[in-house]
């Protein structure tokens, strides 16, 4: 079916969904698709859809519209693929949510803390989606769960290369996701935990400490618990990092997606009181290529500076070399024989190494630390925000930055990331 839209006719398709089925679609490159719920009730990753409201999805978006009771959905625009599936694990995901809600009710009755859930699995099994679903279902029942993001490759609480936590007070927006007001964010500096596993585990512990402090003073946060998203690196040091996170957050439930081996290893290595559940991944989960991941990371950073669909105007200004101190967390590895007596390579991983401003800083992201002095344990201090270096003038001893806020910078300790952002779009 199509309606008249000038020269290029806009493709319009209607889908009748039976109960407990989902419409899956992907938006074609450089296209947008509008979706509208015409009749019935439906949800996208746990967020209810408003009837007769048009939702817009940009190129590359992968969306699943699920209905418990049946509905009619209309899509306008070019999709790479669009089909209705009866084969969905949503009932299992709902059962998981129901079990967590029972734990919250018990916590309320017995004046204890609510469930802390960690979602694990290899890459491309839908971990972030399951987290979003569990958080949305909880908040729709009046809970206030905390979302903890340990996946530095995607950084959905802030930008890639960071770890953080977000107090969820309303369901995720269908188009934009969760409202990112006032997240707690820590600088990691790279998109893979393996570049500095000691720092990664240290920040995990720090996030757990801060979450515990919040639970002590906020009963609602304590009863609601948390949902922890993790990296898809599940072998070797990556596996050890999962075990470390489970212990740091004292998790009660581990949801393993699509990997029996990981499920059995965690069952063996985690304390017996931790409930470990194996759930299937959704058939709608798509494998993402390296290029697609890189594009997603760039989009995430672009959105940080320019807002969702370019609704912000970032500021550009010069910063004097003498006004700031730039550091990198972690010194390069050197042979053990060259290390001072009694020092190990691991100590090196948390070391703050001063960075001399130079042209090689161009396009690199810098985290603005909340620390007031170098003695503040900068690597474990949260960050105020991020800037990207767009130019360096050695003669004038200044570098130009793109910043979401106007000058001056709120603090003068900066941490450099391995991540670069070319502002080309």
Swiss-Prot record:
Residues binding ATP: 22, 62, 124-129
Keyword annotations of the record: ATP-binding, Kinase, mRNA processing, Nucleotide-binding, Nucleus, Transferase, tRNA processing
One cellular-component annotation, GO: nucleus
Biological process (GO), any one: cerebellar cortex development
DNA-binding keyword on record: no
Signal sequence, start to end: none
Subcellular location: Nucleus
Enzyme Commission numbers on file: 2.7.1.78
Superkingdom assignment: Eukaryota
SUPFAM superfamilies: P-loop containing nucleoside triphosphate hydrolases
Enzyme class: transferase
GO molecular function: ATP binding; ATP-dependent polydeoxyribonucleotide 5'-hydroxyl-kinase activity; ATP-dependent polyribonucleotide 5'-hydroxyl-kinase activity; polynucleotide 5'-hydroxyl-kinase activity
Catalytic activity: a 5'-end dephospho-2'-deoxyribonucleoside-DNA + ATP = a 5'-end 5'-phospho-2'-deoxyribonucleoside-DNA + ADP + H(+); a 5'-end dephospho-ribonucleoside-RNA + ATP = a 5'-end 5'-phospho-ribonucleoside-RNA + ADP + H(+)
Annotated family: Belongs to the Clp1 family. Clp1 subfamily.
PANTHER family per record: CLEAVAGE/POLYADENYLATION FACTOR IA SUBUNIT CLP1P, POLYRIBONUCLEOTIDE 5'-HYDROXYL-KINASE CLP1
Quaternary structure (record): Component of the tRNA splicing endonuclease complex. Component of pre-mRNA cleavage complex II (CF-II).
Function, as annotated: Polynucleotide kinase that can phosphorylate the 5'-hydroxyl groups of double-stranded RNA (dsRNA), single-stranded RNA (ssRNA), double stranded DNA (dsDNA) and double-stranded DNA:RNA hybrids. dsRNA is phosphorylated more efficiently than dsDNA, and the RNA component of a DNA:RNA hybrid is phosphorylated more efficiently than the DNA component. Plays a role in both tRNA splicing and mRNA 3'-end formation.
HAMAP family noted in UniProt: Clp1
Protein name per its UniProtKB record: Polyribonucleotide 5'-hydroxyl-kinase Clp1
Gene name of this polypeptide: CLP1
